[in-house]
Each structure stands twice: as structure tokens, then as C-alpha cells.
Amino acid sequence: LEFRRVLFRSLSLPMVVLTAILFFIGVFVSWNIEKAPKGYFALLLLLDTGIVGVFLSLDFFLFYVFWEVMLLPMYFLIGMWGGPQREYAAIKFFLYTLVGSVMMLIAILALYFTCGHTFDMITIMETASTNLVGVSWWGMDAIKVIWVLLFIGFAIKVPVFPFHTWLPLAHVEAPTAISVILAGILLKLGAYGLLRVNYSMLPDAVWWFAGAMAILGLINVIWGALCALAQTDLKKLVAYSSINHMGYAMIGMAAVIAAGEMNG
């Protein structure tokens, strides 16, 4: 139990520090915003609240609430202060993220009802694997179904191929400060969620999907690099390079499982 609490802190602390630094920079980058500056900075602070809340929550209900709190500020920041295609970019981001949120909500409710009607992440971590042993839904292992639902929810945020198409447009159309936050923090939230939820709570299912994660990560690396090479727009270049970088993160997470197998 204590190790897992330390694990949460070790994962969360550097991300909270990174969030504070990038939002501090984002405020200065946005200092010359002329269109509704009060609304802009209010949404920026609300986005900051959602991100920090996700990193610090040990309750699944709060984790999900803060995850959703991030959605609306990003939608309005892109849709109101973005570039020429800002509305299309904002709607595409909203729809992709909404689909992931629905998947995550179904998985969270499934864990709630199978783990003693609790949202406490430590308790779920300790009981999920035991309570889900032998449980089948639609002819499939319940633990695998829940793992896949959570994976899709987080993979859209990473983003993992083929859920990556919202990122280049959102990155290009977003204001510069939001592009910095998008590349610097928001994409990492997906990888953070995979480590904190999928890996920590459902470790038995990870063994089944490590190979698929490695393949998806490899596709991200190759596709992101090739697309980045073809870009002339700096923001698009950063967007595709971010897809490439997160592919390495996916491969790294899969490699942890492979290393565990080799070491017994």
C-alpha cells in the first residue's frame, strides 16, 4: 500500500511541477491577448485546475471530474481564440475527447460495482484483479474489457494511432500558449493515465496487451516522424513530432512488461 502511494507521488510530483512551469510561461505568452482577456485567463486557470486535479486525485470520481473539467476550457480556448479553422478544430477535439470520456466512464462504473462500491483508487488497485477473476462479459474476460475501455480513453489523449487526427489541427489552430500546454502537458496526461490506472489497477491484463501497445507505439514513431519531415508549418511540425515522441513512451511502457517477463 505504501509503495503504491509513493508511486502515485513519484508520478504526480514532476507532472505538477511541469504544469506550474508551463502555465506560468503560458500566462506571459498570452499577456497581449486583446479579445475578452478576462474570459481567456479564467478559462486558462480552469484548465490548470483540471490538469492538477487529475495528477493529484486518489479518488476515481474526482479523477474523472477533473478529467472532464479540462475538456470545456480547451474547447473554448481553441474555438474562440484560435486561428481561421478554430471552430472545426475545437469541435473535432471535443468529439474525440468525449468518446474517450464515455469509454472511461463505463470502465470506472464497472470497477465501482465490482470492487465494493468504492471510488478509492488504492482500494480498487488492491481488489480489482481478485474481484474480476473468472468474470465474463459477452464471452470475454471482464478485466480485459475494462482494460481496453480505459486504454481507448487514455489513448485518444496520448494520442495513439489511429486516434491522432485531432491533434495536428488543434495544435495549429490553438493560440500559441495553448499549443505549448497541449504539447507539453495534455498529451502526457494520456500516458500518465495508462501508468496510473491500467498498469497499477489492472496489471494482469497488461500482459495480454503489451505487444499491441508496442506495435501502436511503433506506428506512432514512424508515422509521426514521416509526417513531421513533410511539414513547413512549425506548429504542425511540433504536433507530428509530439505524436512521434509519445510513440516512444508507448514502446517504453510495453518494454517494461517484456523486461518483467525476462526477469521472471
Task: Locate predicted features.
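Transmembrane helix-loop-helix hairpins at membrane boundaries of multipass inner-membrane proteins
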Residues: 1-44, 117-134
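Juxtamembrane/interfacial segments at transmembrane-helix boundaries in multi-pass membrane proteins
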Residues: 1-5, 102-164, 169, 194-212, ...
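Structural signature of hydrophobic alpha-helical transmembrane segments
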Residues: 10-19, 60-73, 143-156, 204-219
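Hydrophobic residues within membrane-embedded alpha-helical segments of Major Facilitator Superfamily
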Residues: 15, 22, 46, 53, ...
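Central hydrophobic cores of alpha-helical transmembrane segments in multi-pass inner-membrane proteins
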Residues: 16-30, 47-49, 70-80, 149, ...
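Helix-loop junctions at the membrane interface of multi-pass solute transporters
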Residues: 28-36, 75-84, 152, 161-171, ...
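The feature identifies polytopic integral membrane transport proteins across all domains of life
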Residues: 38, 58-61, 89-94, 142-151, ...
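Alpha-helical multi-pass transmembrane bundles of energy-transducing inner-membrane proteins
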Residues: 39, 43-46, 50-133, 138, ...
